[in-house]
Amino acid sequence: KAVFESWKLQGGTKETFLSNLQKNQEVKNIILSESPWVLEAQTEEQQKERIATLFDLNNIRSNNIAALTRLQELQNSNGAWSWYKGMNGSRSVTTYIAELNARLAMLTGEKLSGSALSLQQKAFAYLHQSALDEYKEILKAQKDGVKFTGVSGSILQYLYLIAISGEQVPAANKAAYTYYLSKVGELLTSPSMDTKAIAAIVLDKAGRKKEAQEFVASLKEHLTKTDEQGMFFAFNENPYTWGGMQMQAHVDVMEVLEQTGGNTDTVEEMKLWLLKQKQTQQWNSPVATADA
């Protein structure tokens, strides 16, 4: 914040917001002027101007009200949000929005209130019903001899959301919740780092500490370390699947390592990788930025 205040004291002119790369004529003249680094620099002044507005409290309040109002307009009557207004509700979109609200409350230590709380309660009503409907389908399939291992991605996110928010499971969902929780341990063999991280958080919050540590140990085995980049997962990103997004997996693993304790050095090394991504190429989407 002090940096941006100093820019304001300089008059806040276009020149004070110019990126360091743009100011450096020698760098601009080299052959690398065709590289993405300079393309980044051409927009950095706009980024700085926008970042400066983050410290305007009146602007923050106004944006919060506008965002909540927009979320209210987009939420369906059953509590779900959809990809676009007018479409059927989406479990993944609803879960993601509810997760962000829960994570904000967890990070700030402030409980949701007012319209934010109302939005969250309606979203949970939809997600509880969706989880119950899926449980009924599972019971029906089991009668036909179908066997299930682990839980679906939607259910794992549902369990995670309950774990981090402290949401009380409705009486009608108790049996479904107990069943789902009993199957989480079977995800240890999953190839997805994101799945393992979320499963570990769910297990740890449920008091199944030993099982959670087994997941943590498995996650650590897949971490790569370099002096420059810190610690990270060296795998090819698949932006078309939620669990295949590298940033999502990275921060979820950081979360479980912090939650289970005794991993301070590893978490610090993982923070280094996170910052390096921003330094060299920007976080590549709004989702990745929110996670980071």
Where are these regions (language model features)?
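Large, well-folded core regions of big proteins
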Residues: K1-D291
